[in-house]
Amino acid sequence: MDIISIVLLVLLVVLVVAFIFYAQNIKKNKQDAESLFNEAENKANEVMANAKREAESLKMEAEAFKKEARYTLREEEQKQRREIEDEFKQERQELKETEKRLKQREEILDRKDDTLTKKEENLDSKEENLVRKTDTLSKREEQLAHIEEKKRLELERISNLSTDDAREIILSETRDGLTKEMAQIIRQSEEKAQVEADKRAKNIISLAIQRVSSDSVAEQTVSVVNLPDDGMKGRIIGREGRNIRTFEALTGIDVIIDDTPEAVVLSGFDPIRREIARMTLEQLVQDGRIHPARIEELVEKNRKALDHKMREYGEQAAFEVGAHNLHPDLMKIMGRLHFRTSYGQNVLDHSVEVAHIAGNLAGEMGENVALAKRAGFLHDIGKALDHEVEGSHVEIGTELARKYKENPIVINTIASHHGDTEPLSNIAVLVAAADALSAARPGARRESIENYIKRLKDLEAISTSFEGVETAFALQAGREIRVMVKPEKLTDDQIVILARDVKNRIEDEMDYPGNIKITVIRETRAIDYAK
Protein backbone atom coordinates (compact mmCIF):
# COMPACT_ATOMS: atom_id res chain seq x y z
CA MET A 1 0.00 0.00 0.00
CA ASP A 2 1.56 3.35 -1.10
CA ILE A 3 1.42 6.73 0.61
CA ILE A 4 -1.43 8.15 -1.54
CA SER A 5 -3.68 5.24 -0.73
CA ILE A 6 -3.02 5.77 2.94
CA VAL A 7 -3.80 9.46 2.66
CA LEU A 8 -7.01 8.84 0.74
CA LEU A 9 -8.05 6.25 3.28
CA VAL A 10 -7.46 8.71 6.09
CA LEU A 11 -9.49 11.38 4.28
CA LEU A 12 -12.30 8.99 3.68
CA VAL A 13 -12.32 8.04 7.36
CA VAL A 14 -12.40 11.69 8.34
CA LEU A 15 -15.23 12.44 5.92
CA VAL A 16 -17.20 9.51 7.17
CA VAL A 17 -16.69 10.62 10.75
CA ALA A 18 -17.69 14.15 9.85
CA PHE A 19 -20.69 13.02 7.94
CA ILE A 20 -21.82 10.84 10.79
CA PHE A 21 -21.24 13.64 13.22
CA TYR A 22 -23.07 15.99 10.93
CA ALA A 23 -25.95 13.61 10.53
CA GLN A 24 -26.30 13.17 14.26
CA ASN A 25 -26.10 16.84 14.95
CA ILE A 26 -28.00 18.05 11.86
CA LYS A 27 -30.24 20.00 14.07
CA LYS A 28 -27.39 22.00 15.46
CA ASN A 29 -26.64 25.24 14.06
CA LYS A 30 -24.66 25.70 10.93
CA GLN A 31 -21.90 27.57 12.70
CA ASP A 32 -21.07 24.64 14.83
CA ALA A 33 -21.10 22.42 11.77
CA GLU A 34 -18.74 24.64 9.91
CA SER A 35 -16.50 24.87 12.92
CA LEU A 36 -16.37 21.15 13.19
CA PHE A 37 -15.85 20.84 9.46
CA ASN A 38 -12.97 23.28 9.60
CA GLU A 39 -11.50 21.48 12.57
CA ALA A 40 -11.83 18.18 10.76
CA GLU A 41 -10.32 19.70 7.66
CA ASN A 42 -7.39 21.04 9.68
CA LYS A 43 -6.84 17.67 11.27
CA ALA A 44 -7.06 16.06 7.87
CA ASN A 45 -4.52 18.51 6.50
CA GLU A 46 -2.28 17.85 9.49
CA VAL A 47 -2.63 14.13 8.98
CA MET A 48 -1.89 14.57 5.29
CA ALA A 49 1.21 16.59 6.09
CA ASN A 50 2.42 14.02 8.60
CA ALA A 51 1.64 11.28 6.15
CA LYS A 52 3.60 13.02 3.42
CA ARG A 53 6.55 13.53 5.75
CA GLU A 54 6.46 9.89 6.81
CA ALA A 55 6.09 8.85 3.20
CA GLU A 56 9.13 10.90 2.22
CA SER A 57 11.07 9.48 5.17
CA LEU A 58 10.07 5.94 4.28
CA LYS A 59 10.97 6.58 0.68
CA MET A 60 14.39 7.85 1.66
CA GLU A 61 14.91 4.89 3.99
CA ALA A 62 13.80 2.55 1.23
CA GLU A 63 16.27 4.12 -1.18
CA ALA A 64 19.05 3.88 1.41
CA PHE A 65 18.15 0.26 2.19
CA LYS A 66 18.08 -0.49 -1.51
CA LYS A 67 21.53 1.02 -1.99
CA GLU A 68 22.88 -0.81 1.05
CA ALA A 69 21.35 -4.05 -0.16
CA ARG A 70 22.91 -3.62 -3.56
CA TYR A 71 26.31 -2.88 -1.95
CA THR A 72 26.01 -5.87 0.35
CA LEU A 73 24.96 -8.14 -2.49
CA ARG A 74 27.85 -6.89 -4.56
CA GLU A 75 30.34 -7.53 -1.72
CA GLU A 76 28.84 -10.98 -1.03
CA GLU A 77 29.05 -11.80 -4.68
CA GLN A 78 32.69 -10.70 -4.81
CA LYS A 79 33.47 -12.66 -1.63
CA GLN A 80 31.85 -15.82 -2.96
CA ARG A 81 33.68 -15.33 -6.23
CA ARG A 82 37.02 -15.02 -4.40
CA GLU A 83 36.23 -18.10 -2.28
CA ILE A 84 35.31 -20.08 -5.36
CA GLU A 85 38.49 -18.95 -7.07
CA ASP A 86 40.56 -19.89 -3.99
CA GLU A 87 38.91 -23.29 -3.79
CA PHE A 88 39.48 -23.77 -7.45
CA LYS A 89 43.16 -22.82 -7.06
CA GLN A 90 43.53 -25.17 -4.05
CA GLU A 91 41.87 -28.03 -5.88
CA ARG A 92 44.07 -27.36 -8.88
CA GLN A 93 47.17 -27.41 -6.59
CA GLU A 94 46.00 -30.64 -4.94
CA LEU A 95 45.41 -32.14 -8.33
CA LYS A 96 48.92 -31.17 -9.34
CA GLU A 97 50.37 -32.70 -6.16
CA THR A 98 48.27 -35.83 -6.59
CA GLU A 99 49.40 -36.07 -10.17
CA LYS A 100 52.99 -35.65 -9.01
CA ARG A 101 52.63 -38.37 -6.35
CA LEU A 102 50.99 -40.68 -8.84
CA LYS A 103 53.80 -40.06 -11.22
CA GLN A 104 56.38 -40.82 -8.52
CA ARG A 105 54.50 -43.97 -7.49
CA GLU A 106 54.33 -45.01 -11.07
CA GLU A 107 58.09 -44.60 -11.33
CA ILE A 108 58.56 -46.62 -8.11
CA LEU A 109 56.26 -49.33 -9.42
CA ASP A 110 58.20 -49.38 -12.65
CA ARG A 111 61.44 -49.81 -10.73
CA LYS A 112 59.88 -52.53 -8.55
CA ASP A 113 58.58 -54.20 -11.64
CA ASP A 114 62.08 -54.20 -13.08
CA THR A 115 63.45 -55.54 -9.77
CA LEU A 116 60.80 -58.26 -9.62
CA THR A 117 61.54 -59.19 -13.16
CA LYS A 118 65.24 -59.53 -12.31
CA LYS A 119 64.40 -61.52 -9.16
CA GLU A 120 62.15 -63.82 -11.14
CA GLU A 121 64.97 -64.37 -13.56
CA ASN A 122 67.35 -65.06 -10.64
CA LEU A 123 64.82 -67.40 -9.04
CA ASP A 124 64.39 -69.26 -12.24
CA SER A 125 68.14 -69.60 -12.47
CA LYS A 126 68.41 -70.70 -8.83
CA GLU A 127 65.56 -73.13 -9.28
CA GLU A 128 67.41 -74.71 -12.16
CA ASN A 129 70.54 -74.89 -10.00
CA LEU A 130 68.55 -76.42 -7.12
CA VAL A 131 67.08 -79.01 -9.42
CA ARG A 132 70.55 -79.91 -10.60
CA LYS A 133 71.90 -79.97 -7.02
CA THR A 134 68.90 -82.01 -5.84
CA ASP A 135 69.61 -84.57 -8.48
CA THR A 136 73.27 -84.59 -7.47
CA LEU A 137 72.37 -84.92 -3.76
CA SER A 138 69.95 -87.73 -4.48
CA LYS A 139 72.70 -89.58 -6.26
CA ARG A 140 75.14 -88.89 -3.40
CA GLU A 141 72.56 -90.00 -0.82
CA GLU A 142 72.16 -93.23 -2.68
CA GLN A 143 75.93 -93.62 -2.73
CA LEU A 144 76.21 -92.76 1.00
CA ALA A 145 73.42 -95.17 1.87
CA HIS A 146 75.23 -97.86 -0.05
CA ILE A 147 78.53 -96.96 1.69
CA GLU A 148 76.86 -96.86 5.14
CA GLU A 149 75.33 -100.25 4.54
CA LYS A 150 78.73 -101.62 3.57
CA LYS A 151 80.31 -99.97 6.66
CA ARG A 152 77.57 -101.33 8.93
CA LEU A 153 78.08 -104.82 7.57
CA GLU A 154 81.85 -104.45 7.92
CA LEU A 155 81.52 -103.13 11.52
CA GLU A 156 79.21 -105.98 12.44
CA ARG A 157 81.71 -108.40 10.97
CA ILE A 158 84.68 -106.83 12.80
CA SER A 159 83.01 -106.19 16.18
CA ASN A 160 80.76 -109.22 16.19
CA LEU A 161 77.94 -106.85 17.30
CA SER A 162 74.55 -106.45 15.71
CA THR A 163 72.97 -103.03 15.17
CA ASP A 164 70.68 -103.51 18.17
CA ASP A 165 73.62 -104.39 20.41
CA ALA A 166 75.55 -101.32 19.28
CA ARG A 167 72.48 -99.14 19.85
CA GLU A 168 72.15 -100.52 23.38
CA ILE A 169 75.81 -99.72 24.11
CA ILE A 170 75.39 -96.15 22.85
CA LEU A 171 72.20 -95.68 24.87
CA SER A 172 73.93 -97.02 27.97
CA GLU A 173 76.82 -94.59 27.52
CA THR A 174 74.34 -91.76 26.96
CA ARG A 175 72.47 -92.69 30.13
CA ASP A 176 75.73 -92.72 32.09
CA GLY A 177 76.63 -89.30 30.72
CA LEU A 178 73.21 -87.90 31.57
CA THR A 179 73.45 -89.40 35.05
CA LYS A 180 76.76 -87.61 35.59
CA GLU A 181 75.29 -84.35 34.32
CA MET A 182 72.28 -84.77 36.62
CA ALA A 183 74.56 -85.49 39.55
CA GLN A 184 76.58 -82.37 38.74
CA ILE A 185 73.43 -80.26 38.51
CA ILE A 186 72.15 -81.68 41.80
CA ARG A 187 75.52 -81.07 43.46
CA GLN A 188 75.59 -77.48 42.20
CA SER A 189 72.03 -76.94 43.44
CA GLU A 190 72.95 -78.38 46.84
CA GLU A 191 76.05 -76.18 47.03
CA LYS A 192 73.99 -73.13 46.10
CA ALA A 193 71.35 -74.02 48.70
CA GLN A 194 74.11 -74.58 51.28
CA VAL A 195 75.61 -71.17 50.52
CA GLU A 196 72.21 -69.51 50.84
CA ALA A 197 71.48 -71.43 54.04
CA ASP A 198 74.88 -70.48 55.50
CA LYS A 199 74.28 -66.85 54.58
CA ARG A 200 70.83 -66.88 56.17
CA ALA A 201 72.12 -68.72 59.26
CA LYS A 202 75.00 -66.26 59.70
CA ASN A 203 72.56 -63.38 59.41
CA ILE A 204 70.24 -64.88 62.02
CA ILE A 205 73.13 -65.76 64.35
CA SER A 206 74.66 -62.29 64.04
CA LEU A 207 71.31 -60.69 64.83
CA ALA A 208 70.88 -62.99 67.83
CA ILE A 209 74.39 -62.50 69.21
CA GLN A 210 74.52 -58.72 68.81
CA ARG A 211 71.44 -58.47 71.03
CA VAL A 212 73.19 -60.38 73.85
CA SER A 213 75.60 -58.52 76.07
CA SER A 214 77.02 -60.53 78.95
CA ASP A 215 80.05 -60.30 81.19
CA SER A 216 82.36 -63.28 81.35
CA VAL A 217 85.00 -63.68 84.03
CA ALA A 218 87.26 -66.70 83.97
CA GLU A 219 86.75 -68.71 87.13
CA GLN A 220 89.72 -69.89 89.18
CA THR A 221 90.34 -73.12 91.07
CA VAL A 222 91.82 -71.27 94.04
CA SER A 223 90.59 -68.64 96.47
CA VAL A 224 92.77 -66.22 98.42
CA VAL A 225 91.91 -65.11 101.97
CA ASN A 226 93.66 -62.00 103.22
CA LEU A 227 95.05 -62.02 106.77
CA PRO A 228 95.57 -59.07 109.12
CA ASP A 229 99.12 -60.26 109.81
CA ASP A 230 101.37 -63.24 109.27
CA GLY A 231 100.95 -64.32 112.89
CA MET A 232 97.45 -65.48 111.99
CA LYS A 233 98.98 -68.27 109.89
CA GLY A 234 100.21 -70.07 113.02
CA ARG A 235 96.80 -69.84 114.66
CA ILE A 236 95.19 -71.29 111.52
CA ILE A 237 97.60 -74.22 111.62
CA GLY A 238 97.02 -74.78 115.33
CA ARG A 239 98.89 -76.91 117.80
CA GLU A 240 100.45 -79.82 115.93
CA GLY A 241 98.32 -78.81 112.91
CA ARG A 242 95.00 -79.85 114.42
CA ASN A 243 93.15 -76.73 113.23
CA ILE A 244 94.25 -77.03 109.62
CA ARG A 245 93.60 -80.80 109.59
CA THR A 246 90.09 -80.27 110.97
CA PHE A 247 89.45 -77.49 108.48
CA GLU A 248 90.61 -79.56 105.49
CA ALA A 249 88.68 -82.62 106.68
CA LEU A 250 85.40 -80.73 107.09
CA THR A 251 85.62 -78.65 103.90
CA GLY A 252 87.55 -80.98 101.58
CA ILE A 253 89.73 -78.05 100.51
CA ASP A 254 93.53 -77.80 100.65
CA VAL A 255 94.87 -74.89 102.71
CA ILE A 256 98.15 -73.63 101.25
CA ILE A 257 100.22 -71.56 103.65
CA ASP A 258 103.45 -70.38 102.08
CA ASP A 259 105.67 -67.32 102.09
CA THR A 260 102.99 -65.11 100.55
CA PRO A 261 102.63 -62.25 103.02
CA GLU A 262 99.31 -61.84 104.79
CA ALA A 263 97.47 -64.34 102.58
CA VAL A 264 96.32 -67.95 102.64
CA VAL A 265 95.38 -69.86 99.47
CA LEU A 266 92.45 -72.29 99.38
CA SER A 267 92.76 -74.81 96.55
CA GLY A 268 90.06 -77.18 95.34
CA PHE A 269 88.18 -78.12 92.20
CA ASP A 270 84.73 -78.07 93.85
CA PRO A 271 83.68 -74.39 93.84
CA ILE A 272 80.92 -75.00 96.40
CA ARG A 273 83.25 -76.52 98.98
CA ARG A 274 85.85 -73.88 98.19
CA GLU A 275 83.27 -71.12 98.78
CA ILE A 276 82.25 -72.70 102.11
CA ALA A 277 85.91 -72.89 103.08
CA ARG A 278 86.50 -69.25 102.11
CA MET A 279 83.49 -68.00 104.09
CA THR A 280 84.50 -70.09 107.12
CA LEU A 281 88.13 -69.00 107.09
CA GLU A 282 87.24 -65.32 106.73
CA GLN A 283 84.87 -65.58 109.70
CA LEU A 284 87.48 -67.43 111.77
CA VAL A 285 90.08 -64.77 111.04
CA GLN A 286 87.63 -62.00 111.86
CA ASP A 287 86.40 -63.70 115.06
CA GLY A 288 89.86 -64.75 116.22
CA ARG A 289 88.61 -67.92 117.91
CA ILE A 290 90.15 -70.73 115.91
CA HIS A 291 89.76 -74.26 117.23
CA PRO A 292 88.18 -77.48 115.91
CA ALA A 293 84.78 -77.00 117.56
CA ARG A 294 84.46 -73.46 116.22
CA ILE A 295 85.57 -74.60 112.79
CA GLU A 296 82.92 -77.35 112.74
CA GLU A 297 80.24 -74.90 113.86
CA LEU A 298 81.05 -72.32 111.19
CA VAL A 299 81.35 -74.90 108.40
CA GLU A 300 77.84 -76.20 109.13
CA LYS A 301 76.48 -72.67 109.42
CA ASN A 302 78.03 -71.55 106.14
CA ARG A 303 76.85 -74.70 104.36
CA LYS A 304 73.25 -73.75 105.20
CA ALA A 305 73.87 -70.10 104.32
CA LEU A 306 75.30 -71.13 100.96
CA ASP A 307 72.23 -73.30 100.26
CA HIS A 308 70.08 -70.22 100.77
CA LYS A 309 72.42 -68.14 98.60
CA MET A 310 72.31 -70.73 95.82
CA ARG A 311 68.50 -70.55 95.78
CA GLU A 312 68.78 -66.76 95.44
CA TYR A 313 71.23 -67.14 92.55
CA GLY A 314 68.82 -69.54 90.83
CA GLU A 315 65.80 -67.27 91.36
CA GLN A 316 67.68 -64.24 90.08
CA ALA A 317 68.86 -66.06 86.96
CA ALA A 318 65.38 -67.50 86.28
CA PHE A 319 63.86 -64.04 86.61
CA GLU A 320 66.47 -62.61 84.23
CA VAL A 321 65.63 -65.07 81.44
CA GLY A 322 61.88 -65.09 82.13
CA ALA A 323 61.66 -68.76 83.20
CA HIS A 324 58.44 -68.46 85.22
CA ASN A 325 56.76 -71.15 87.36
CA LEU A 326 60.04 -73.00 87.78
CA HIS A 327 60.01 -75.59 90.58
CA PRO A 328 61.81 -74.28 93.72
CA ASP A 329 64.10 -77.30 93.79
CA LEU A 330 65.11 -76.64 90.19
CA MET A 331 65.92 -73.03 91.12
CA LYS A 332 68.18 -74.24 93.92
CA ILE A 333 69.89 -76.73 91.62
CA MET A 334 70.38 -74.01 89.00
CA GLY A 335 71.88 -71.81 91.72
CA ARG A 336 74.51 -74.50 92.34
CA LEU A 337 75.73 -73.86 88.77
CA HIS A 338 76.98 -70.46 89.94
CA PHE A 339 79.77 -72.38 91.64
CA ARG A 340 80.47 -74.71 88.70
CA THR A 341 82.79 -73.96 85.80
CA SER A 342 83.37 -75.54 82.41
CA TYR A 343 86.74 -74.71 80.85
CA GLY A 344 86.84 -71.69 83.17
CA GLN A 345 83.36 -70.45 82.13
CA ASN A 346 80.76 -70.01 84.89
CA VAL A 347 78.03 -72.54 84.05
CA LEU A 348 75.14 -70.44 85.41
CA ASP A 349 76.28 -67.42 83.40
CA HIS A 350 76.68 -69.73 80.42
CA SER A 351 73.11 -71.03 80.90
CA VAL A 352 71.71 -67.49 81.06
CA GLU A 353 73.66 -66.53 77.95
CA VAL A 354 72.42 -69.63 76.09
CA ALA A 355 68.85 -68.77 77.12
CA HIS A 356 69.16 -65.25 75.68
CA ILE A 357 70.80 -66.42 72.45
CA ALA A 358 68.23 -69.22 72.00
CA GLY A 359 65.41 -66.74 72.61
CA ASN A 360 66.80 -64.35 69.99
CA LEU A 361 67.26 -67.19 67.50
CA ALA A 362 63.71 -68.39 68.16
CA GLY A 363 62.40 -64.87 67.62
CA GLU A 364 64.17 -64.67 64.26
CA MET A 365 62.85 -68.12 63.27
CA GLY A 366 59.28 -67.54 64.43
CA GLU A 367 59.44 -70.12 67.24
CA ASN A 368 58.20 -69.89 70.86
CA VAL A 369 60.66 -67.45 72.46
CA ALA A 370 59.68 -68.16 76.09
CA LEU A 371 59.97 -71.93 75.63
CA ALA A 372 63.32 -71.56 73.86
CA LYS A 373 64.67 -69.44 76.75
CA ARG A 374 63.43 -71.98 79.31
CA ALA A 375 65.04 -74.87 77.43
CA GLY A 376 68.30 -72.95 77.01
CA PHE A 377 68.31 -72.01 80.70
CA LEU A 378 67.90 -75.63 81.85
CA HIS A 379 70.03 -77.39 79.22
CA ASP A 380 73.10 -77.84 81.52
CA ILE A 381 71.25 -78.40 84.81
CA GLY A 382 72.78 -81.87 85.08
CA LYS A 383 76.22 -80.32 85.66
CA ALA A 384 75.08 -79.25 89.12
CA LEU A 385 74.96 -82.90 90.24
CA ASP A 386 77.20 -84.81 87.81
CA HIS A 387 79.95 -85.16 90.44
CA GLU A 388 77.49 -86.52 93.00
CA VAL A 389 75.24 -88.76 90.87
CA GLU A 390 76.32 -91.41 88.38
CA GLY A 391 75.82 -90.66 84.72
CA SER A 392 76.62 -87.85 82.31
CA HIS A 393 75.26 -84.37 82.89
CA VAL A 394 72.90 -84.92 79.91
CA GLU A 395 71.37 -88.03 81.51
CA ILE A 396 71.13 -86.39 84.94
CA GLY A 397 69.56 -83.23 83.49
CA THR A 398 67.02 -85.26 81.50
CA GLU A 399 65.98 -87.20 84.62
CA LEU A 400 65.65 -83.99 86.64
CA ALA A 401 63.45 -82.41 83.95
CA ARG A 402 61.23 -85.51 83.88
CA LYS A 403 61.07 -85.62 87.68
CA TYR A 404 59.83 -82.03 87.90
CA LYS A 405 57.45 -82.47 84.92
CA GLU A 406 59.02 -80.02 82.52
CA ASN A 407 57.71 -79.53 78.96
CA PRO A 408 58.58 -82.50 76.67
CA ILE A 409 60.36 -80.07 74.33
CA VAL A 410 62.57 -78.95 77.23
CA ILE A 411 63.31 -82.59 78.13
CA ASN A 412 64.24 -83.43 74.54
CA THR A 413 66.38 -80.29 74.31
CA ILE A 414 68.40 -81.31 77.39
CA ALA A 415 68.78 -84.86 76.06
CA SER A 416 69.84 -83.82 72.55
CA HIS A 417 71.96 -80.70 73.01
CA HIS A 418 75.18 -82.77 72.75
CA GLY A 419 73.87 -85.05 70.00
CA ASP A 420 73.18 -88.03 72.28
CA THR A 421 69.61 -88.29 70.97
CA GLU A 422 67.74 -86.95 67.96
CA PRO A 423 66.28 -83.44 68.38
CA LEU A 424 62.51 -83.55 67.96
CA SER A 425 61.86 -79.82 67.61
CA ASN A 426 63.36 -76.70 66.12
CA ILE A 427 63.85 -75.33 69.63
CA ALA A 428 66.15 -78.25 70.50
CA VAL A 429 68.28 -77.45 67.45
CA LEU A 430 68.33 -73.73 68.30
CA VAL A 431 69.43 -74.39 71.89
CA ALA A 432 72.23 -76.67 70.67
CA ALA A 433 73.36 -73.89 68.33
CA ALA A 434 73.13 -71.30 71.11
CA ASP A 435 75.17 -73.60 73.40
CA ALA A 436 77.90 -73.88 70.75
CA LEU A 437 77.87 -70.11 70.15
CA SER A 438 78.20 -69.32 73.85
CA ALA A 439 81.04 -71.80 74.30
CA ALA A 440 82.87 -70.76 71.11
CA ARG A 441 82.66 -67.03 71.82
CA PRO A 442 86.22 -65.67 72.14
CA GLY A 443 87.13 -65.37 75.81
CA ALA A 444 84.22 -67.45 77.05
CA ARG A 445 86.32 -70.52 77.80
CA ARG A 446 89.99 -71.12 78.19
CA GLU A 447 92.23 -74.05 77.56
CA SER A 448 95.79 -74.70 78.51
CA ILE A 449 98.37 -72.70 76.61
CA GLU A 450 100.20 -75.91 75.75
CA ASN A 451 97.15 -77.41 74.03
CA TYR A 452 96.52 -74.15 72.21
CA ILE A 453 100.07 -73.87 70.88
CA LYS A 454 100.15 -77.56 69.98
CA ARG A 455 96.96 -77.23 67.94
CA LEU A 456 98.36 -74.27 66.01
CA LYS A 457 101.61 -76.13 65.31
CA ASP A 458 99.72 -79.23 64.18
CA LEU A 459 97.61 -77.15 61.80
CA GLU A 460 100.68 -75.59 60.23
CA ALA A 461 102.53 -78.92 60.10
CA ILE A 462 99.67 -80.68 58.31
CA SER A 463 99.37 -77.84 55.80
CA THR A 464 103.10 -77.68 55.00
CA SER A 465 103.40 -81.46 54.61
CA PHE A 466 101.90 -81.36 51.12
CA GLU A 467 104.06 -81.00 48.04
CA GLY A 468 104.13 -77.53 46.52
CA VAL A 469 103.31 -75.73 49.79
CA GLU A 470 105.71 -72.90 50.59
CA THR A 471 104.44 -71.92 54.05
CA ALA A 472 101.29 -71.91 56.21
CA PHE A 473 99.97 -69.60 58.92
CA ALA A 474 97.39 -70.44 61.59
CA LEU A 475 95.21 -67.38 62.28
CA GLN A 476 92.32 -66.36 64.55
CA ALA A 477 93.24 -68.71 67.40
CA GLY A 478 93.39 -71.67 65.04
CA ARG A 479 90.03 -71.02 63.38
CA GLU A 480 91.68 -70.29 60.01
CA ILE A 481 94.74 -71.66 58.23
CA ARG A 482 96.24 -69.84 55.25
CA VAL A 483 98.41 -71.94 52.94
CA MET A 484 100.84 -70.22 50.55
CA VAL A 485 101.80 -72.42 47.57
CA LYS A 486 104.54 -72.20 44.95
CA PRO A 487 102.92 -71.01 41.70
CA GLU A 488 105.38 -72.92 39.53
CA LYS A 489 104.50 -76.21 41.26
CA LEU A 490 100.69 -76.03 41.50
CA THR A 491 98.04 -74.74 39.08
CA ASP A 492 94.79 -72.99 39.96
CA ASP A 493 92.89 -76.26 39.55
CA GLN A 494 95.35 -78.16 41.75
CA ILE A 495 95.02 -75.75 44.69
CA VAL A 496 91.30 -76.60 44.89
CA ILE A 497 92.26 -80.25 45.35
CA LEU A 498 94.97 -79.22 47.85
CA ALA A 499 92.42 -77.34 49.99
CA ARG A 500 90.21 -80.43 50.09
CA ASP A 501 93.16 -82.70 50.98
CA VAL A 502 94.21 -80.39 53.82
CA LYS A 503 90.62 -80.36 55.11
CA ASN A 504 90.47 -84.17 55.08
CA ARG A 505 93.80 -84.49 56.94
CA ILE A 506 92.71 -82.01 59.61
CA GLU A 507 89.38 -83.79 60.10
CA ASP A 508 91.09 -87.19 60.38
CA GLU A 509 94.02 -86.26 62.62
CA MET A 510 92.85 -83.41 64.88
CA ASP A 511 90.17 -82.67 67.47
CA TYR A 512 89.01 -79.05 67.52
CA PRO A 513 85.92 -77.01 68.43
CA GLY A 514 83.83 -75.35 65.73
CA ASN A 515 85.04 -75.01 62.13
CA ILE A 516 88.44 -74.31 60.61
CA LYS A 517 88.63 -72.27 57.41
CA ILE A 518 91.30 -73.42 54.93
CA THR A 519 92.45 -70.72 52.49
CA VAL A 520 94.96 -71.69 49.78
CA ILE A 521 96.69 -68.74 48.10
CA ARG A 522 98.59 -68.98 44.80
CA GLU A 523 100.28 -65.74 43.77
CA THR A 524 102.03 -65.13 40.45
CA ARG A 525 104.06 -61.98 39.91
CA ALA A 526 105.58 -60.60 36.71
CA ILE A 527 108.28 -57.99 37.34
CA ASP A 528 110.19 -55.95 34.79
CA TYR A 529 112.08 -52.67 34.84
CA ALA A 530 111.74 -49.78 32.42
CA LYS A 531 115.15 -48.34 31.55
Swiss-Prot record:
Annotated EC: 3.1.-.-
Membrane topology reported for the UniProt record: Single-pass membrane protein
Transmembrane portions of the chain: 3-23
UniProt xrefs under SMART domains: HDc (SM00471), KH (SM00322)
Matches recorded under Gene3D superfamilies: Hypothetical protein af1432, K Homology domain, type 1
S-S bonds: none
Matches recorded under InterPro entries: HD/PDEase_dom, HD_domain, HDIG_dom, KH_dom, KH_dom_type_1, KH_dom_type_1_sf, Ribonuclease_Y, RNase_Y_N
Subcellular localization(s) per the UniProt record: Cell membrane
GO molecular function terms listed in the Swiss-Prot or TrEMBL record: RNA binding; RNA endonuclease activity
Family: Belongs to the RNase Y family.
NCBIfam families recorded: HDIG, RNase_Y
Name assigned to this protein: Ribonuclease Y
Organism name: Lactococcus lactis subsp. lactis (strain IL1403) (Streptococcus lactis)
Gene: rny
